[in-house]
């Protein structure tokens, strides 16, 4: 059962300019430590760093739309983090207000599954999020919130 769907498209150069202008203040406010570590491993090429951050920014926007809140109502940027499953597939881990909102949307006896697709083609980055409620046994096969 689909709980929510969200998508976002962003100009990578916009994120690059914000990083240039606001630096650590922006990065600390929006991204988790794991997201920052992943982006900084690509530091040899600044456009790769900007694209990595832009995809994660778009994923957070898409996830907040799938939650039905946007970035408000107790859902904040760092409450949503992009992580990769062992096979490399991206998903979201929710904490704080985002997790509270997800729990409220998930029917009793079911588990939330978050499917995420992220991509970029300079100068654009895109993310698409589908949040589904699945039976507990199906949780083993996919990504879930933690």
UniProtKB/Swiss-Prot annotation:
It is found in: Cytoplasm. Pfam families: ACPS. Its EC number is 2.7.8.7. InterPro entries: 4-PPantetheinyl_Trfase_dom (IPR008278), 4-PPantetheinyl_Trfase_dom_sf (IPR037143), ACPS (IPR002582), Ppantetheine-prot_Trfase_dom (IPR004568). Gene3D superfamilies: 4'-phosphopantetheinyl transferase domain (3.90.470.20). One of its GO terms (biological process) is fatty acid biosynthetic process. Its cofactor is Mg(2+). It is an enzyme of class 2 (transferase). GO terms for molecular function: holo-[acyl-carrier-protein] synthase activity; magnesium ion binding. It catalyses: apo-[ACP] + CoA = holo-[ACP] + adenosine 3',5'-bisphosphate + H(+). Belongs to the P-Pant transferase superfamily. AcpS family. This is Holo-[acyl-carrier-protein] synthase. It comes from Rhodopseudomonas palustris (strain TIE-1). The gene is acpS.
């Amino acid at each position: 059962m689909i709980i929510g769907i969200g998508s976002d498209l962003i100009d990578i150069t916009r994120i690059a300019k914000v990083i240039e202008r606001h630096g650590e203040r922006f990065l600390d406010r929006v991204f988790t430590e794991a997201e920052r570590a992943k982006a900084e491993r690509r530091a040899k090429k600044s456009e790769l760093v900007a694209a990595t951050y832009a995809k994660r920014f778009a994923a957070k926007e898409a996830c907040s739309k799938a939650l039905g809140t946007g970035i408000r109502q107790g859902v904040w940027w760092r409450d949503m983090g992009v992580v990769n499953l062992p096979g490399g597939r991206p998903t979201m881990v929710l904490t704080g207000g985002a997790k509270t909102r997800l729990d409220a949307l998930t029917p009793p006896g079911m588990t939330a599954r978050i499917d995420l697709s992220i991509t970029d083609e300079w100068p654009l980055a895109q993310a698409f999020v589908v949040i589904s409620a699945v039976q507990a046994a199906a949780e083993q096969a996919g990504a879930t919130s933690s």
